[in-house]
Amino acid sequence: MDYDMTTNHIKSLIDNNCLDEAIHLLSHRIETNKEDDEAYYLMGNVYRKQGNIKMAMFYYTSATEINAHSPAAEAYRVLLDIRNFINPDYNP
């Protein structure tokens, strides 16, 4: 399966809440290419969709460390704003 088809398939899995399968495919993709910022971004989306904000932020950070222009940078900022709004203790 080529890269674009795999990416589209993973996005479809995420959209359809087939999150375990998406995690499996993304984990394999990250194992085979540690510099795949898109895979880290998509993994962050999976964890965000599961409500695991801590892991989502971890993967978004990983993506932006590889590519500062990744959409993960904006996703991270949005999650940070939400976290600070919900729990003002994080924002002294």
Model-derived segments and their meaning:
Residues 34, 67-68:
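Short coil turns that delineate tetratricopeptide repeat
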Residues 42, 75-76:
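Canonical tetratricopeptide repeat
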